[in-house]
């Protein structure tokens, strides 16, 4: 077992959608003005479509290892109290605010981590093989209508 320091972020979010790309700047400006006037939590209550909006957008403590690369690159250089620009998440946009940062010492069971990674990789490969097999069956199947 190894000991490792883990960086944790206390995050809050505002998740919003737009009708079309032209509305992005307008919506972003409205949200930023609201954050400046009434604060991030109240703005999350108003604008966020996420369930976390009921709690002022607060997500809780999140390990940097649990963040996607896209999100990590956006928040990595921010200081406590700062927020990201809107991050495109496909169907919606995400604004994250760092409320606090802390480091925790964590004991790492190397065997367990290796076992988890092997299991994840095996599952990924099985999914890939099953898709390939399904596509072959789909190609070779003829459906005759009456």
Protein language model annotation of sequence segments:
Residues 83-89:
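Short acidic-hydrophobic surface loop/beta-edge motif
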Residues 1-35, 46-69, 95-125:
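Well-structured core secondary-structure elements of compact alpha/beta domains
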Residues 74-76, 81-83:
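Glycine-centered loop/turn motifs
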Residues 135-145:
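Short, low-complexity, Pro/Ser/Thr/Gly-rich segments in the mature regions of secreted, periplasmic
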Residues 40-45:
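Short, well-structured alpha-helical segments that form the helix of a local strand-helix-strand
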């Amino acid at each position: 077992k190894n000991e490792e320091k883990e960086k944790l972020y206390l995050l809050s979010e505002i998740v919003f959608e737009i009708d079309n790309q032209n509305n992005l700047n307008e919506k972003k400006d409205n949200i930023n003005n609201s954050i400046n006037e009434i604060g991030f939590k109240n703005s999350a209550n108003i604008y966020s479509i996420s369930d976390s909006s009921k709690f002022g957008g607060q997500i809780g403590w999140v390990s940097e290892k649990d963040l996607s690369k896209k999100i990590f690159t956006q928040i990595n250089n921010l200081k406590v109290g700062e927020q990201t620009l809107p991050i495109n998440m496909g169907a919606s946009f995400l604004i994250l605010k760092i409320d606090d940062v802390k480091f925790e010492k964590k004991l790492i069971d190397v065997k367990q981590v290796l076992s988890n990674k092997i299991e994840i990789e095996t599952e990924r490969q099985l999914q890939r093989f099953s898709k390939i097999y399904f596509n072959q069956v789909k190609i070779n199947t003829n459906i005759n209508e009456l």
